[in-house]
UniProtKB/Swiss-Prot annotation:
Annotated catalysed reactions: N(6)-[(R)-lipoyl]-L-lysyl-[glycine-cleavage complex H protein] + glycine + H(+) = N(6)-[(R)-S(8)-aminomethyldihydrolipoyl]-L-lysyl-[glycine-cleavage complex H protein] + CO2
Quaternary data: The glycine cleavage system is composed of four proteins: P, T, L and H. In this organism, the P 'protein' is a heterodimer of two subunits.
InterPro entries: GcvPB, GDC-P_C, GDC-P_N, GDC_P, PyrdxlP-dep_Trfase, PyrdxlP-dep_Trfase_major, PyrdxlP-dep_Trfase_small
Identification of the protein by name: Probable glycine dehydrogenase (decarboxylating) subunit 2
Cofactor needs: pyridoxal 5'-phosphate
Domain of life: Bacteria
Biological process annotations from GO: glycine decarboxylation via glycine cleavage system
Organism: Bacillus velezensis (strain DSM 23117 / BGSC 10A6 / LMG 26770 / FZB42) (Bacillus amyloliquefaciens subsp. plantarum)
Positions of modified residues (N6-(pyridoxal phosphate)lysine): K273
Function, in words: The glycine cleavage system catalyzes the degradation of glycine. The P protein binds the alpha-amino group of glycine through its pyridoxal phosphate cofactor; CO(2) is released and the remaining methylamine moiety is then transferred to the lipoamide cofactor of the H protein.
Known EC number: 1.4.4.2
GO molecular function: glycine binding; glycine dehydrogenase (decarboxylating) activity; pyridoxal phosphate binding
Record-stated family: Belongs to the GcvP family. C-terminal subunit subfamily.
Amino acid sequence: MNNQDQALIFEMSREGRIGYSLPELDVPETELESLLPGDYIRDEDAKLPEVSELDIMRHYTALSKRNHGVDSGFYPLGSCTMKYNPKLNEKIARIAGFSAIHPLQDEDTVQGALELLYDLSGHLEEITGMDEVTLQPAAGAHGEWTGLMMIRAYHEARGDFGRTKVIVPDSAHGTNPASATVAGFETITVKSNEHGLVDIEDLKRAVNEETAALMLTNPNTLGLFEENITEMAEIVHQAGGKLYYDGANLNAVLSKARPGDMGFDVVHLNLHKTFTGPHGGGGPGSGPVGVKKEFIPYLPKPVLTKKEGRLTFDYDRPQSIGRVKPYYGNFGINVRAYTYIRSMGPDGLKAVTENAVLNANYMMRRLAPYYDLPYDRHCKHEFVLSGRRQKKLGVRTLDIAKRLLDFGYHPPTVYFPLNVEESIMIEPTETESKETLDAFIDAMIQIAREAEESPEIVQEAPHTTVVKRMDETKAARKPVLKYERTLDGSR
């Protein structure tokens, strides 16, 4: 069977075939009915595949070869910071003192692990310019919600119950308005100006006594630095609102600028992005939230504190918004982030930003003659092109993304941000070499030429992948979410 026809694991099943043998029972046997109510006990055996260990290994090894990750190729997914994750991180995370402990252990038995969390919080405070950090949130959007809940608690503690609106720019990540809604706020959108930055006059019109916060990414999702950030902070603060920093793009300013110095009050970070936790497969992530002093009472509890040289969790936090996650955050990702920060140091983190920005600008300038550049100015860590020129030739941005698969690349982010027509969002990160960037650029140039000379090549792509184009509408409206085999053996 070739890679094109890889069977489902269920189709490989043969009755009586065994992949693993359990040891003999060495404890008293107990009837399942004595442990579980009848409603929870199966009436028939689960339809699990019966396959050998060798079959399993070959099956999943074959499937893994269809996957694409940072370790296998360039991954320029804009706004996702798909940088290489140093394998040193994995070695440290596997140390028994970190990997073989349990969150319910007595605090005295895990002081080393707690010291790592305490030190990591301190490093993140220094990097962001915040006064205290919680490591509880599990990922970026979770961090957003946590930060907004603290902002809500802050306003309500002051009796300011009328602050029910959160302002977001039209270039914002989709999680920003979603998090605001889940936190109980109404979202107000402000537009971008002709330079791709927040329109200051529109912001002034939007801010009023109902404003709870302005959520902002800096640099923004166009890869452009909001150069008027201090003026924006003053506008919002004078109206009694607060500034929330979406840390998705922190890779662009490490050791160069700090959100706290820009005027932000609450910050969330994506340790799985900026600080090299492996991501892209659905988790786990880590989305710590940093706050200025006035928000410390509202931090999720428990809060890790040091008393007389001993680390302990403080649960006596009457104004806390409460727990936002079981236990104390995704510890394994925090270990990896700590390892990265300590191994890089301040100068190394500064070099990260410098090289990320250099790579992005190099790519942008080389591609500008072949694709529209909606905002022709220096970018930070990422940039946005437009496929408007190709669209006039009958080639959509989606077609360009599909064609890149034939060259062995994961496509960039497409159709985001929403305020750029046929947008193509590229983030090379600092870890890619010039040779890799040039090879990707050459592929993009070839696709642009194909759109002019042989558009059907791009329109019908991909040509080399196991799965070609799917019916995306049907996949969205009538997804097949479970395996069922009919009596004749067909799917």
